[in-house]
A protein has these predicted regions:
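Conserved helicase motor
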Residues: 73-85, 102-108, 208-212
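Conserved P-loop NTPase motor "coupling/switch" region that bridges the ATPase
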Residues: 64, 68-71, 76-77, 121-146, ...
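Conserved motor-coupling elements within RecA-like helicase/translocase cores
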Residues: 81-99
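Conserved pre-motif I regulatory segment
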Residues: 1-24, 28-32, 189, 198, ...
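Short basic/glycine-enriched coil/helix segment immediately N-terminal to the Walker B
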Residues: 10-14, 68, 89-93, 120, ...
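Walker B catalytic acidic pair
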Residues: 184-185
C-alpha cells in the first residue's frame, strides 16, 4: 500500500483518479483513505459506488482492514421499490463509517427535483446560446437542426420533471448525509452530455446517459458542500476511445478549475489542449479523409 496515495485520497481528495497496480491495493487505498479521513474529521460518511457484483467483496476487504468498522452494505432486496425508502433512511440516520452499494443502486437514489431542474435549464441555455452563434456565423443547416433537436429533447425532460408533484416518500441524495464519494470503475460514467459545435470529427461523442447525468449532479453537490474535496474516482482507463472522455472526467473532478480558467465549454477546452487534424485513413468503404 502506498501511504502517499492514502494521504492524497483521504486528505487532499480534490477529485483524484487512482490508477491501481492491482485490485487489492486499490480497494485498500480507498478504504484506508475513507477511514483516515473520518479519523481526522475531514469527512463524516463515505459512500462507495462499486460494480454491482463486487459489493460483497468490497465489504469483506473493508472488514479485513478495519474489523471494527461500522459499515452498511446494500443488497438487491434493499433497493426493491418496497424497501428502498427504508434503506435510504437507514443511511441518513445511521452513524456509518461507510456505505457500500452497486452502481445501479447508486443511480436509484435521486437528486432533489430542484437540482435536476437547474442542470437541465443550464444545458438548455448553453444550447440556445450555441444555436444563436451558429445562425450568426451561417453554419450548416444540418448542425443547427441537430442542436435544436437536442434542445427540444431536454425541454421535454424538463417539462416532464416540472409536471411531477413533489414525492414525499423519496429520500434524496442530499438527505443521506454523505460527504465523500468513492467510485470504483469510474470509466463506466464516461458518457456525460457534451455540447459542441464541432462536427464530422472521429471519436467525438455527444451521447448522453442518465447515469452520467446523475453522477454529474451528485459530484457538483459534493463540490458545493466540501469545497471541491469530496470525490475520488478509481479507474485504470480514464480515457479509452475519445478525448471527450478526458474532458468528462475533468467536469466530474475539476469543475472549479475549468470555471476559473474559462474552459467549462468543450470547444474552449479542446482548442486549448488539442487541435483538429485531417488525414487519409482506411474506412469500410475505402480510404477517406478523417478529421480527428
Amino acid at each position: 500500500m502506498e501511504r502517499g496515495k492514502i494521504w492524497r485520497n483521504g486528505y487532499a481528495a480534490a477529485g483524484c483518479i487512482s490508477r491501481p497496480k492491482d485490485y487489492l491495493s486499490l480497494s485498500f487505498e480507498m478504504i484506508a483513505a475513507a477511514m483516515e479521513g473520518k479519523r481526522l474529521g475531514l469527512c463524516q460518511k463515505s459512500l462507495f459506488a462499486v460494480p454491482n457484483h463486487l459489493t460483497e467483496q468490497w465489504a469483506s476487504e473493508f472488514l479485513r482492514l478495519y474489523p471494527s468498522a461500522n459499515i452498511l452494505v446494500a443488497s438487491k432486496k434493499d433497493f426493491e421499490p418496497a424497501n428502498r425508502k427504508k434503506f435510504c433512511a437507514r443511511i441518513a440516520t445511521g452513524n456509518y463509517d461507510a456505505v457500500i452499494m452497486g452502481h445501479s443502486q447508486f443511480e436509484k437514489i435521486p437528486m432533489s427535483k430542484e437540482r435536476q431542474e437547474r442542470l437541465l435549464e443550464e444545458q438548455i441555455e448553453e444550447i440556445t446560446d450555441g444555436i444563436a452563434e451558429l445562425k450568426e456565423s451561417r453554419a450548416e443547416r444540418f448542425t443547427i437542426k441537430e442542436l435544436e433537436r437536442t434542445k427540444k429533447n431536454l425541454q421535454v425532460k424538463l417539462e416532464k420533471l416540472q409536471a411531477e408533484g413533489k414525492k414525499d416518500n423519496v429520500v434524496t441524495f442530499e438527505e443521506l448525509g454523505v460527504d465523500r464519494l468513492y467510485v470504483d470503475e469510474a470509466h463506466s460514467f464516461k458518457n456525460a452530455f457534451i455540447y459542441t459545435k464541432m462536427r464530422n470529427v472521429a471519436g467525438l461523442s455527444t451521447t448522453d446517459s442518465q447515469k452520467s447525468a446523475d453522477i454529474l449532479m451528485k459530484c457538483r453537490y459534493l463540490d458545493e458542500i466540501t469545497g471541491n474535496r469530496g470525490i475520488v474516482f478509481a479507474t485504470g482507463t480514464p480515457v479509452s476511445n475519445s478525448m471527450t472522455e478526458m474532458y468528462t472526467m475533468m467536469r466530474y473532478l475539476q469543475r472549479d478549475t475549468l470555471d476559473k480558467k474559462h474552459l467549462n465549454h468543450f470547444d474552449a477546452w479542446a482548442s486549448t489542449f488539442g487541435e483538429t487534424t485531417t488525414a487519409i485513413e482506411l474506412a469500410p468503404e475505402g480510404y477517406a479523409l478523417i478529421g480527428r
